[in-house]
Amino acid sequence: MLKDLYKSHIVPSLKTKLGYSNVMQVPKIVKVCLNIGLGIRGSDSKVMNSCVRDLALIAGQKPVATYAKKSIAGFKIRKGFPIGCKVTLRNNKMYEFLERLIHVVLPREQDFKGLSVSQFDGCGNLSIGIKEHISFLEIDYDKIDKILGVDINIVTNAVNNNDAKLLLMEFGFPFIN
């Protein structure tokens, strides 16, 4: 399991690579946030229910619906309209999800060559977009209404992008260059 790998192998390795004197200085993954945005389709209760069901299967816990904060005429949404769902994973469920993401989902993603450094936000957090949620093994292709995209945000307590990249490479994330 990734949690055991982190404690036994990754922490000592990063401590020497980054030159830290204390193990508490070593960066770690704090949480993983999953989001499915539906936009105007969120007002359809059938689509919204399938979105919630699929995200619950992917994450292993119940997602929360997200609502529009303000009206935008160009997108045909009004304040308070449901526009998607999200879930935040921490601790054991987070590590289980990351293991599935690294070893199953990313290799199954079509035209995936690796993660780029440009996907970091400058503070050590990584954002990944999965184009088709059917890449997850938990989703049965015959039971889905529409193929949805999933946004995955991996939040670390790393000081900068380089430390976060080293951390994620130790976990086995495939990076380009």
From Swiss-Prot:
It comes from the Bacteria. InterPro entries: Ribosomal_uL5, Ribosomal_uL5_bac-type, Ribosomal_uL5_C, Ribosomal_uL5_CS, Ribosomal_uL5_dom_sf, Ribosomal_uL5_N. The keyword Heme does not apply. PROSITE patterns: RIBOSOMAL_L5 (PS00358). GO terms for cellular component: ribonucleoprotein complex; ribosome. It holds the Pfam family Ribosomal_L5. The keyword tRNA-binding applies. One of its GO terms (biological process) is translation. GO terms for molecular function: rRNA binding; structural constituent of ribosome; tRNA binding. Keywords: Ribonucleoprotein, Ribosomal protein, RNA-binding, rRNA-binding, tRNA-binding. Part of the 50S ribosomal subunit; part of the 5S rRNA/L5/L18/L25 subcomplex. Contacts the 5S rRNA and the P site tRNA. Forms a bridge to the 30S subunit in the 70S ribosome. NCBIfam families: PRK00010.1. This is one of the proteins that bind and probably mediate the attachment of the 5S RNA into the large ribosomal subunit, where it forms part of the central protuberance. In the 70S ribosome it contacts protein S13 of the 30S subunit (bridge B1b), connecting the 2 subunits; this bridge is implicated in subunit movement. Contacts the P site tRNA; the 5S rRNA and some of its associated proteins might help stabilize positioning of ribosome-bound tRNAs. HAMAP family: Ribosomal_uL5_B (MF_01333_B). Belongs to the universal ribosomal protein uL5 family. This is Large ribosomal subunit protein uL5. The lineage of its organism: Bacteria, Pseudomonadati, Pseudomonadota, Alphaproteobacteria, Rickettsiales.
